[in-house]
Regions:
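Conserved N-terminal structural module of periplasmic/extracytoplasmic solute-binding proteins
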Residues: 1-24, 35-42, 84-85, 223-225, ...
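Hinge/lid segment of periplasmic solute-binding proteins
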Residues: 13-68, 96-97, 123, 213-217, ...
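Short helix-initiation/N-cap motifs at beta->coil->alpha
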Residues: 1, 15-16, 89-96, 171-185
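C-terminal capping/gating helix-and-loop segments adjacent to ligand/active sites or protein-protein/ligand interfaces
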Residues: 53, 228, 270-277, 288-311
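Extracytoplasmic/periplasmic substrate-recognition and gating elements
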Residues: 80-83, 165-166, 205-270
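A structural signal for short loop-to-beta-strand junctions that line the ligand-binding cleft
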Residues: 7-8, 39-77, 98, 109-112, ...
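Extracytoplasmic/periplasmic solute-binding protein
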Residues: 54-63, 68, 78, 93-145, ...
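Glycine-centered hinge/linker elements that transmit conformational signals in sensory
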Residues: 97-101, 141-174
């Protein structure tokens, strides 16, 4: 960005650079292109576009959204005599009772980690706060809150400590995500929080044993919570009028309903648009992904996850 030597299309990702790029003046405001094409603009929620805006102008076009929930191992639940809830455990206490039951059968209940961003522990932590009533949910949907000393945050921290102490693997403290995911693939833990991008790994014999996909079920976090946040969108890095038009045309192509479904089927990317009709063929070819799409509407609480790694 500082050099000004940008490609015509700038891919944006986890390290959201929208504001930085917009401030630099090196990327193009694409608000007018959205306004001139209402059908395209309708693909995105106001929240999606606001997230990709700077000073009221849209600079990024999101190609997916980020959600996460709990994956569980059906065989391990059966071994423990547990029946998984259709949607979610009603309360965290109910969830802990299930963890105690799993533990009594010598089954490690959950995957957690602390290295790097502590991704898995972060998702548990976000859920603990985000489902703690209106106040907790508001906190988890506030960007850069200034007060982390409220009772609900303190309580969530204590609950996370409880999970690390009692319900996870011995290598969780200091452990990296990849190792903890492998524990789940190898049926060494019963539950792991993550998003739909992980589903293709369940089918890959490079990651998981053959047939593992059929062992996996999903549920929302206790209290029917689900992380759901907009994602940083791709930007136009040219000022040449003809190249801008071509870049916008590509962004439109990239976000057609057909291509959003292709990204879902091939890479597990969640469609950014909520008005896409999911074909019956997906229910046959990838029933777990179809279940992910179905369960989203049953979430009582939705929230972000960034707050958990600001501590």
């Amino acid at each position: 960005i500082s050099s000004g030597d940008l490609p015509d299309i700038v891919l944006n990702g986890g390290n959201n650079i929208t504001a930085l790029a917009a401030k630099s003046g090196k990327v193009t405001d694409i608000t007018e292109y959205l306004d001139k094409d209402p059908e395209w603009k309708a693909m995105f929620s106001d929240q999606d576009l606001e997230f990709n805006s700077y000073e009221g102008k849209v600079y990024g076009i999101p190609v997916s959204k980020e959600i996460s929930y709990i994956y569980y191992n059906k065989d391990l639940f059966k071994k423990a005599g547990l029946e998984a809830p259709d949607v979610a455990y009603e309360t965290w206490d109910d969830f802990y009772k299930a963890c105690d039951t799993l533990k009594s059968k010598n089954i490690t209940p959950v995957s957690m980690d602390t290295a790097d961003l502590g991704w898995l522990s972060n998702l548990w932590y976000s859920g603990l706060i985000g489902t703690a009533g209106e106040e907790g949910n508001k906190f988890m949907n506030t960007m850069y809150p200034t007060d982390y000393t409220s009772d609900l945050v303190v309580n969530a921290t204590e609950q996370l400590q409880k999970m690390l102490k009692n319900y996870t693997t011995s290598d969780a403290a200091g452990g990296k995500y990849d190792t903890m995911a492998t524990h789940f693939f190898n049926s060494e833990v019963a539950m792991l929080p993550n998003g739909p991008w992980m589903i293709p790994d369940f089918k890959s014999t490079d990651k998981a044993p053959e047939g593992f996909y059929d062992k996996v079920g999903i549920m929302l976090l206790p209290g029917s919570g689900m992380e759901s946040v907009p994602t940083p969108g791709d930007m136009v890095g040219t000022k040449d009028p003809e190249k801008v038009k071509a870049a916008v045309a590509f962004l439109k192509f990239e976000t057609t309903a057909e291509n959003q479904l292709k990204a879902l089927e091939m890479a597990g990317l969640q469609p950014v648009s909520s008005n896409i009709e999911v074909p019956d063929s997906l229910k046959e070819s990838d029933p777990l992904m179809a279940e992910v799409l179905d369960i989203q509407s049953k979430a009582k609480y939705t929230y972000g996850q960034n707050q958990a790694y600001w501590y």
